[in-house]
Amino acid sequence: MDYSEHPPPPALDGLVKARWTLAGGGAPGDWIEQQAVPDGCVEIIRRRAGRSRWNGDQPAAFAVGLIERPEGFGISGDARFEGLRIWPWAWSLLSDIPLAALRGRWLPFAAAGIEERLAAARALAATGRIIVAAHSVEEMSRGTGMSPRTLQRWFAAHVGLPPRTYLRLLRFHKAFEQVPAQPSLADHAAASGFADQAHMARDFRALAGVPAKEARRAARGPFLT
């Protein structure tokens, strides 16, 4: 399996986390099983070839909502995908479907001019950059200028999760993405904002389904291979 991702253009920073591609790299009759872990994002996906399946066969164009546990999916060996990984607050710029209806599942979704529509939302992008960079709910509140209660309402409307729950997903996924290159899990836990290595271990078991040591070997982008 060949997976690669690229940062978004500056105009989309705060709304889009990454562009990515995925190819099975095998024959049409092959079937490749993977695990996706929570990353705090909504995925807008276009399959250019082959087949994919998660709780049933998927169409050529679909969106995947926030997940809060590892989810298994399969792709045929000849499958090829292009995806846009957006922060959840960007979803309302593209669809009237509530985020709650997309949580933990996929829905058929196709839209034209996605990046152009997102690029016009400069104020929302600025708020998004503050949210993503924050290390605590208090930092989110100070940076955005929202009171704690207003921030709670904003998250309910634009994310579908409480701020503290969402911050946990962001902290975990940052640690997950970087864990393959880490010689010391204890140092990695401290650098990633966990209270200690045991704290990181609990989140890896809950959100990746495997210990951090195993994830260090098997993590590839947002997947466990």
Please place each PLM-identified region on the residue numbering.
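DNA major-groove recognition helix of helix-turn-helix
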Residues: 155, 167, 204-205, 216
